[in-house]
Amino acid sequence: MSVALWQQCLNFLQDELSSQQFNTWIRPLQAEDGDANELCLLAPNRFVRDWVNDKYLKRINELLRDLASGKPPKVQLTVGSRRNVAMSSPRDLGAPVSATTMNASRPTEAPAVHAAPRAKGDYADEQEIDRLREREETPRRGGGERQVQVEGSLKHQSGLNPNFTFETFVEGKSNQLARAASRQVAENPGGAYNPLFLYGGVGLGKTHLMHAVGNHLAGQRENAKVVYLHSERFVADMVKALQLNAINDFKRFYRSVDALLIDDIQFFAGKERSQEEFFHTFNALLEGGQQMILTSDRYPKEISGVEERLKSRFGWGLTVAIEPPELETRVAILMKKADQAKVDLPHDAAFFIAQKIRSNVRELEGALKKVIADSHFMGKPITQDFIRESLKDLLALQDKQVGVDNIQRTVAEYYKIKLADLLSKRRSRSVARPRQVAMALAKELTNHSLPEIGDAFGGRDHTTVLHACRKVQTLKEESADIREDYKNLLRLLTS
């Protein structure tokens, strides 16, 4: 009875939450009837359980009270899974997906942003792990001189940047989950979130968080062997080891680390021998309880040129997306960087830069460095006018890239309507809502005035544009769909 009530509750939660929130936190929960009018919700791991308990349990209880004909069931939120139980499947989510029961030596896969549930066939069979256990090392060929060269090139160098710590990382809505997951890994390495897979565009903080975890682990234990490297360095080390007939030294080095942090894993694409070696390294580290953190510019399943068995393993722990920072976070980043540089940056100046530079943190910091340098060399205070002059080339390039016409075409394509209809006088919701969204985007992404934006949308009055902007802001707060649409369009226009 309680499970049926949970299915109704899911329908409301799906309407109220964004698709990212629902798929990440609610959809993975498995429901079963407990004793004495109890509803047991089973989370795949402690991280999901704690997050749901803090953020969503209150709303779940409210919905159950509203939906129950009598006394609402008491919710028991625990970590666990059942054999052959169907995952929660509200309307419009398709047929129920059977939960995969994995060998105890493998961590349960945590939910991933935008990730579809995996089929049983995605996981490697037990024989692969058995073969790894039984595999004997091939005797090494080659002389002692070559051996010294390879061991020297693979000596423990962490590669960590001491400036990248949790304390210097600016948290916001766009990276809150990634930071929380990284902190959990730093406190409990080799646990349920192994590997931790962070993905997102360039300059969003993936590398910073990876270093922050590494620095924390290295600081906890004096002899901790924490290694950070780019995926291409892993490939280069393997190639050198093969050339010197010392592949066993390569294997011993990478399989003896306490934590292995590999950046830009997508560069393994097309490198079959490197993928083969990393596959076995991955298995060895996982079985040894050694932590792995991987980053990529895209979701694991979307990395082309990488074997399916590797992509499947990338999702065995926790997969988290990092989004471009929202305005408030961009301002906070600028203020923190200015404080670190001991520069007096007025808040309105930081706000102005943050409004203009939206794509990623790297470009944001680059713009601030230029403004600070120009201010220092010219002996002038940092004001909005000064920033406008200092960054005029960058701002002109951005305006050229994100013009009103580009916004109009992108919005029309996104909503699958004709551009002519978007600019017409038609007032049907299927056209009016995209038009309002396009106007709001034009106000946020360009330097055009409201009258100029109105002219570009079929000669409309500036008050119409102002109304559209206010309407979209309200809709973003009330509607998960509009909020998701707006975020997707921002990404399309600024990436």
Swiss-Prot record:
Main location class: cytoplasm
Residue span of region Disordered: 86-127
Pfam family, one: DnaA_N
GO cellular component, one term: plasma membrane
Region of interest (Domain II), ranges: 83-158
This protein's domain notes: Domain I is involved in oligomerization and binding regulators, domain II is flexibile and of varying length in different bacteria, domain III forms the AAA+ region, while domain IV binds dsDNA.
The protein's name in its UniProt record: Chromosomal replication initiator protein DnaA
Organism of provenance: Chromohalobacter salexigens (strain ATCC BAA-138 / DSM 3043 / CIP 106854 / NCIMB 13768 / 1H11)
